[in-house]
From Swiss-Prot:
The keyword Electron transport does not apply. Residues 60-117 bind DNA. Keywords: DNA-binding, Fertilization, Nucleus, Transcription, Transcription regulation. The lineage of its organism: Eukaryota, Fungi, Dikarya, Ascomycota, Pezizomycotina. GO terms for cellular component: nucleus. This is Mating-type protein MAT-1. It comes from Curvularia kusanoi (Cochliobolus kusanoi). It is found in: Nucleus. GO terms for molecular function: DNA binding, bending.
C-alpha cells in the first residue's frame, strides 16, 4: 500500500525551478487566494537562478583561415601599394593570387596557423609573426621583391588608379621550398615555428598525422633574368660546391687511412729484406713449371749398351785393371798426356774407344747420322 507524503521544501524548489514560463503561468492561475499568490511570487523571486542540467553545447569550431586572405595580408605590404587604399588594391592582389605559383604552400601554412589558433587562441599566436618565420624558411618572395621576381609592372591609369600588367614573355617560377626535399605537412610547419619559440603553449596532437601535406622538389626552376633570383641560385650553387668539396676531402682522408696499413706493411717487409739479405752463395732456384713433360721410357740401344759396358767394367776388381784388354792403370807411366781418359777408382780406359769422332774430322761426311738422345719426349 502506497503512502502519500508531503513534498519537502527542496523538492518543491527544484520543481518550481525546472518549470517553463507557460507552466508557471498555469501554477499562478491555480492559486485562488491573493495572499497565497503573493507568497508564491515572493518565494519565486528569491529562488536561485535556474541551472540547466543538460551539458553546454561545445563551442562552434572556428572557420579555417582562407589562404587568399593571408596572401593578401602579407603582400599588401608591397611598398608600391602604400599610396592607395585597400579598396583599390583588392583587384590587383586578386590578379597576383591567380598567377601565384605557390597557392598550395599558402593553403598549407594557413591550415597550420588555424590549428594553432584553435588550441591556444589568436592572442597567443600572432599571424604576422607566424608568417615572418615560415615564409623565409620556405623561400617565398619578400613583399618588396614580389613584383620584380614574378615579372609584374605597376602603372597608373588616367584616373589615377593603379594597374598591373605582365609581359607575355615573362615566365613565372615556383619560388619556394628550394631547400626542402621531403613531404611537407602541417605538423612540419608547426614544429618549425615552435623551434623559434612561437606558440610555445601549443601541444601537438600525438599519434595523429595530418592528411594535408605537400611534396616539393629541390630542383625547381628559377627566373633566369632576375638578378635577385639569380643571386639566390648562385648562393645555393656555392653552398652545394662547398659541400661537395668537403665530401671529397673526407673520402680522400678515409681512403688514405684505409690504404696506410697496407703501405706500412709493405715497407716493413722491404726493410726486413734489406736488413737481412740472403747469403751470396745460397742457391735460389728460379720459378719453374710443375707441369714438366713426362719422359718417354721406350728402349734405346745406345744407352742400353753404354749402361751394360759401365756395369761390366765396374764389377771387375781394380787390382786386375791392368790385365784388361785396352785398359791401363792410372799409375802406368805409359799413359799419354794428350789423350782423354775416363777414371773410376784406379781404373782408366781410353775415351776414344767410346766416342766416335768421325763426324768431327776435317772432310767428314756432313750427313753422318748421330745418336738420338730421345729418352725424353720433347713437346
Amino acid at each position: 500500500m502506497n503512502l502519500t507524503r508531503d513534498p519537502t521544501g527542496a523538492e518543491i524548489a527544484r520543481f518550481i525551478a525546472t518549470r517553463t514560463g507557460a507552466q508557471m503561468v498555469e501554477l499562478m492561475r491555480c492559486i485562488s487566494e491573493p495572499a497565497a499568490q503573493a507568497a508564491f511570487t515572493a518565494n519565486l523571486l528569491a529562488a536561485p537562478p535556474v541551472v540547466d542540467a543538460r551539458p553546454a553545447a561545445s563551442e562552434r569550431a572556428r572557420k579555417a583561415l582562407n589562404a587568399f586572405v593571408r596572401f593578401r595580408c602579407y603582400y599588401v605590404a608591397i611598398p608600391m601599394f602604400k599610396q592607395w587604399p585597400m579598396k583599390k588594391l583588392s583587384n590587383l592582389i586578386g590578379l597576383l593570387w591567380e598567377a601565384d605559383p605557390n597557392k598550395s604552400l599558402w593553403s598549407l601554412m594557413t591550415k597550420a596557423w588555424s590549428t594553432i589558433r584553435d588550441q591556444i587562441g589568436k592572442e597567443q599566436a600572432p599571424l604576422d609573426q607566424f608568417f615572418s618565420i615560415i615564409c623565409p624558411h620556405l623561400r617565398l618572395p619578400d613583399p618588396a621583391l614580389y613584383l620584380e621576381i614574378h615579372g609584374w609592372t605597376l602603372t597608373v591609369d588616367q584616373e589615377g588608379d593603379p594597374t598591373i600588367s605582365r609581359s607575355l614573355n615573362s615566365r613565372s617560377s615556383s619560388i619556394g621550398t628550394g631547400n626542402i626535399d621531403i613531404a611537407l605537412s602541417v605538423e612540419d610547419i608547426i614544429a618549425y615555428v615552435q623551434s623559434f619559440g612561437y606558440a610555445a603553449s601549443f601541444t601537438p596532437t600525438t599519434n595523429v598525422s595530418s592528411p594535408t601535406f605537400l611534396g616539393q622538389s629541390t630542383n625547381l626552376p628559377l627566373e633566369n633574368n632576375n638578378p635577385t633570383t639569380a643571386a639566390t641560385q648562385a648562393a645555393s650553387k656555392i653552398a652545394q660546391a662547398r659541400l661537395l668539396a668537403r665530401n671529397k676531402r673526407r673520402a680522400k682522408r678515409q681512403t688514405a687511412k684505409e690504404t696506410g696499413y697496407r703501405v706500412n706493411l709493405d715497407q716493413d717487409i722491404l726493410n726486413a729484406h734489406q736488413i737481412s739479405p740472403p747469403p751470396m752463395n745460397r742457391y735460389m732456384p728460379d720459378p719453374y713449371s710443375t707441369f714438366a713433360p713426362t719422359p718417354n721410357h721406350s728402349p734405346n740401344p745406345f744407352y742400353d749398351g753404354l749402361t751394360g759396358f759401365l756395369s761390366e767394367q765396374a764389377s771387375i776388381e781394380q787390382v786386375n785393371a791392368a790385365t784388361l784388354h785396352n785398359t791401363h792403370s792410372l799409375s802406368d807411366s805409359g799413359l799419354s798426356g794428350d789423350m782423354s781418359y775416363m777414371t773410376m777408382d784406379n781404373f782408366a780406359t781410353n775415351m776414344p774407344n767410346l766416342i766416335d769422332y768421325d763426324a768431327f774430322r776435317l772432310g767428314a761426311n756432313e750427313d753422318v747420322t748421330l745418336p738420338l738422345f730421345d729418352d725424353i719426349a720433347h713437346a
